[in-house]
């Protein structure tokens, strides 16, 4: 019988996701600027919603690029 390995969330459950924490947000965005899906990030549904809102807010504020400038 094969058991699925339980993934640990990369962000602690009680830890707030702030749009000003650009280094954290960059970990959840592809090189093309797309937000990674929950099945890849390993976040809970609530954390994924908060992360998406934070990334979008950071983009609007100019802290995070819509598309990666490198390459």
UniProtKB/Swiss-Prot annotation:
The keyword Transport does not apply. It comes from the Bacteria. Pfam families: Ribosomal_S18. GO terms for biological process: translation. Transmembrane segments: none annotated. Keywords: Ribonucleoprotein, Ribosomal protein, RNA-binding, rRNA-binding. The keyword rRNA-binding applies. GO terms for cellular component: cytosolic small ribosomal subunit. SUPFAM superfamilies: Ribosomal protein S18. GO terms for molecular function: small ribosomal subunit rRNA binding; structural constituent of ribosome. Part of the 30S ribosomal subunit. Forms a tight heterodimer with protein bS6. PANTHER family: 30S RIBOSOMAL PROTEIN S18, SMALL RIBOSOMAL SUBUNIT PROTEIN BS18M. Binds as a heterodimer with protein bS6 to the central domain of the 16S rRNA, where it helps stabilize the platform of the 30S subunit. HAMAP family: Ribosomal_bS18 (MF_00270). Belongs to the bacterial ribosomal protein bS18 family. NCBIfam families: S18 (TIGR00165). This is Small ribosomal subunit protein bS18. The lineage of its organism: Bacteria, Bacillati, Cyanobacteriota, Cyanophyceae, Synechococcales.
């Amino acid at each position: 019988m094969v058991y699925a390995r339980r993934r640990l969330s990369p962000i602690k459950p009680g830890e707030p996701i702030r749009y000003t924490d650009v280094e954290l947000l960059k970990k959840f965005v592809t090189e093309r600027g797309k937000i990674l899906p929950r099945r890849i990030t390993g976040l809970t549904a609530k954390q994924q919603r908060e992360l998406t809102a934070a990334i979008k807010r950071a983009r609007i504020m100019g802290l995070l690029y819509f598309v990666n400038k490198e390459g």
